[in-house]
């Protein structure tokens, strides 16, 4: 995306896929979840930064099977991401 990022974490290089296939030689580390306020491009970037930092803390080098949920209730607009953290060998 070409807009400014509002993420609170420094960027981390991480492979991200919506496909659930795990590459050969990789190990699954667990599921990671992040949720932030807002439903827009900035909230998506902020949420992705939070998700990659949580995965990185587990030792992950990639995320697979990523799912996006955007709740637009009047009183609680949120962007949430869920993915499986893996380590590529």
Predicted regions and their residues:
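N-terminal presequence-like segments and the immediate start of the first folded domain
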Residues: 1-31, 86
């Amino acid at each position: 995306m070409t807009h400014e990022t509002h993420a609170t974490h420094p960027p981390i290089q991480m492979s991200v896929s919506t496909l659930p296939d795990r590459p050969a030689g990789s190990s699954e580390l667990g599921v990671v979840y992040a949720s932030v306020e807002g439903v827009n491009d900035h909230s998506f970037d902020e949420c992705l930064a939070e998700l990659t930092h949580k995965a990185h803390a587990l030792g992950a080098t990639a995320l697979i099977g990523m799912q996006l949920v955007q709740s637009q209730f009047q009183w609680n607009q949120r962007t949430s991401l869920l993915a499986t953290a893996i380590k590529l060998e």
